[in-house]
Amino acid sequence: MSELSDEASEPELLKRSLSMWHGLGAQGSPEELDVPLDLHTAASIGQHEVVKECVQRGELDLNKKNGGGWTALMYASYIGHDTIVHLLLEAGVSVNVPTPEGQTPLMLASSCGNESIAYFLLQQGAELEMKDIHGWTALFHCTSAGHQQMVKFLLESGANANVREPVYGYTPLMEAAASGHEIIVQYFLNHGVKVDTRDHSGATACMLARQFGHMKIVALMETHSPVLPKSLYRSPEKYEDLSSSDESWPVPQRQRPCRKKGLSIHEGPRALAKITAIGLGGKTQTTYEQVPPRGYVTFTSSDENTMESEGLCYRDVTSPINEQDVESSSSSSREEPTFCASLGPVWRSSSSDGLARAQGLSSEASIESNEDSDHARKSSVRKQTRSYLKNKSRHGNSDGHWPSSTGPASIPGSEPQTEKSPYSGPQDLATLLEQIGCLKYLQVFEEQDIDLRIFLTLTESDLKEIGITLFGPKRKMTSAIARWHSSARPPSDALELAYADRLETEMQELAIQLHKCCEEAEALRGQVSQEQELRAVVESCLLEQDSARKDIHAQLQEAQTLAQDAALVLDQLRACQAELSARLRQHHSPREGTPNPHFLSADSKGWPIPLQALSLPELSGALEDRVHEMGQALCSVTQSLEKLQMLNAKKWREP
């Protein structure tokens, strides 16, 4: 895993085959290496035929749990294998068997947004209001994960939107407001949930949204809730000010960890515990008792890493699903902001990097995931850090680790400012790299003659070009650069330099967006090229068909001309025959003009056998009959040719 780079994405890895090394000189037959899949593994990776075979045999207990406490239905519901879920439900598996954490298959499907699977489970009698050991229902799980359609589906299915988790008194609306899920909040408001419900600390959903900087949600909820008197907010134990202005909304006077986006289903109330770790009394806790969750192993930091001994390093080891194996990979690999709005930096990177630092090993194997939530998390951290520093400046608190932001609010004359604290950030590149655990890359930057000022202008593509190809260190550096531009004051007091630094940050974000747009444009160009090639092929086929049709049409016209000539000859023959018959009738009696039926018996060609025995009137009568038959046949041929020629005619002349 230490050789993985950012060029190997998860979908590409899933498409590749897995191989196993059996040692030097190990020779195994295909029969020995062909190990059959068990039911749980087959359900988790989508092997429908294997699961179907296990169900048809009837020898296995389909409700049996593995070592992690999960059933086959839980794996299929969590990952999203609809056909396997349907197969297991038809076999009669139990839909309400919980995991050791109390999570049912419906909760697992809701946490991943698998709406169709949730529908199947509810049809088979899954309990909609069943709670896990933390008091969370399926609606809580999909709300925390931000699955909009799943929330809408559960509300339409009759889920209780006013349910409260017992530890902190949160409702699903509070969870959505604190997480910044604006559309989900709109769903709850349209559903008619109670907006004035308070948690155990006295905060409403609107207060939580304001606290985490989600002002759109605040404005949305203010239209659905009555305006409270300001005296209620002026209480010493409440927030200072609840104005909707982005410039004046405060952060409570207490330490509160920065909220992470896209939480795992296993974190749940633990995340709420981090958010509401301190009451509303305005006192800041100086120390926190950090206990690793289940599935983690702690390591004591060495004496050399004294700077990093303040944080607790966790290490995830195996499965990204079961907590018995380890917490979800999407949660363990998220990186909390290093430069958080607190009295000091919070040192926590990816879990694998924490283990590497604790053991004094390389951190190249650290891989961070969830790129989509990383951008949203950094945006939330910027707002929280900016507002926190403004609030500290307003109250004269100068013991912050970072000074006020270099945005427009710091321009002289815009508002009264107190005495600025000296810049206490990293003074050189080595210090910054040491803080983020990438000091070993200092030599790479020194070879390229890159100092701190140049480093803070680098983008992700620049780092890759320099030689930083591993995903973990590269993400740490780009995150540190973005956090520095959003919260740190530049080493110079010149307004032009501050403005240039902010523009540089915006240019980096625009460059990322431009790169994505270029990739989309390139994909569209490829599609257009394929469309043009297909159009050229179709046009060539149409031209060939048109040429063949013209040839057939010419041949039909020629055949029709020949048929018309034959018809003209036939008309002349009829005229001659009529004249001959008229003359013969003048010299013979009517008895002799009647043909003898004995001589009209035709052979294979339709003519009488003894032609010499026929009298002239008999021969004339036979000739007249044959001419009539020839006329009918020629008429049919002519009409057939007309039908072939007039392919587009709606009505054809009947023969």
Curated annotation (Swiss-Prot):
Residues modified as 3-hydroxyasparagine: N96
ANK repeat positions: 34-64, 68-97, 101-130, 134-163, 168-197, 201-220
Entry coiled-coil feature ranges: 500-575
Residues recorded as bearing Phosphoserine in the entry: S2, S5, S201, S225, S243, S244, S245, S319, S366, S369, S373, S540
Gene3D superfamilies to which the protein is assigned, alphabetical: Ankyrin repeat-containing domain (1.25.40.20), Transcription Factor, Ets-1 (1.10.150.50)
Stretch list, region Disordered: 314-426
The protein's assembly and partners: Homooligomer. Interacts (via SAM domain) with ANKS6 (via SAM domain). Interacts with BICC1. Interacts with NPHP1. Interacts with NEK8. Interacts with HIF1AN. Interacts with NEK7; this interaction alters the subcellular distribution of NEK7 by preventing its nuclear translocation.
PTM comment, free text: Hydroxylated at Asn-96, most probably by HIF1AN.
Major subcellular site: other
Biased composition (Basic residues): 378-395
Protein name stated in the entry: Ankyrin repeat and SAM domain-containing protein 3
Role summary: May be involved in vasopressin signaling in the kidney.
Cystine residue pairs: none
Domain of life where this protein originates: Eukaryota
PTM annotation (Phosphothreonine): residues: T318
Gene name of the encoded protein: Anks3
Gene Ontology cellular-component annotations: cilium; cytoplasm
InterPro entries linked: ANKS3_SAM, Ankyrin_rpt, Ankyrin_rpt-contain_sf, SAM, SAM/pointed_sf
Tissues in which the UniProt entry reports expression: Kidney (at protein level).
Annotated stretches, region: Interaction with NEK7: 1-421
